[in-house]
Amino acid sequence: MSKVILTHEVTGLGSAGDVVEVKDGYARNYLVPQGFAISWTRGGKKQVEQIKAARAARELHSMEAAQELKAKLEATRVKLVVKAGREGRLFGSVKTADVAEAVKAAGIGELDKRKIELPNAIKAVGDHEATVRLHEDLSAMITLQVVAAN
C-alpha cells in the first residue's frame, strides 16, 4: 500500500489535500501519472497544509458560485439533439460529455463531465434527469430533453 497526497478531487477517495492509502499499482499507474496525486514524502506535510489553506480560501467563493449555478441548472431544461430511429430509440446513448457540451451550448456554464451522473443509460428520446455534483455538499438535478435530429 502506498500513501499519496491527492492534488485533485477523486471520486471515492477524497478531495485535494487529503492523504490516502491506496494500492501501489493504482498510485503508480493512474493517480500519479494523471496528476491526481503526488507521492507522500517527509515534506508532504507542508504540502498538505498549503493545499488545504488554498482550498479553504477558494471554498467560500466556490460555494457561492456553485449555488448560483445550481439555480440556473435547475431552472433550465437542457436540450440534446441526437440521432434516433423511428421509434425514438437512439443510435448509441447520451454520454456525460454530451450533457456537459449541451449545458455549455445553452449558455448556463461549463461543467466537468466527471461530475455529471446519469442514473441509467439514456437510450431513448424524451425527458430524463441527471445529477451534477457542484461542490462537496451541493448537487443539482438537470432536466434533459432528448430530441431526435431531423
Curated annotation (Swiss-Prot):
SUPFAM superfamilies: L9 N-domain-like (SSF55658), Ribosomal protein L9 C-domain (SSF55653). One of its GO terms (biological process) is translation. The keyword rRNA-binding applies. It comes from the Bacteria. One of its GO terms (cellular component) is ribonucleoprotein complex. Pfam families: Ribosomal_L9_C, Ribosomal_L9_N. Keywords: Ribonucleoprotein, Ribosomal protein, RNA-binding, rRNA-binding. One of its GO terms (molecular function) is rRNA binding. Binds to the 23S rRNA. HAMAP family: Ribosomal_bL9. Belongs to the bacterial ribosomal protein bL9 family. PANTHER family: 50S RIBOSOMAL PROTEIN L9 (PTHR21368). This is Large ribosomal subunit protein bL9. It comes from Leifsonia xyli subsp. xyli (strain CTCB07). The gene is rplI.
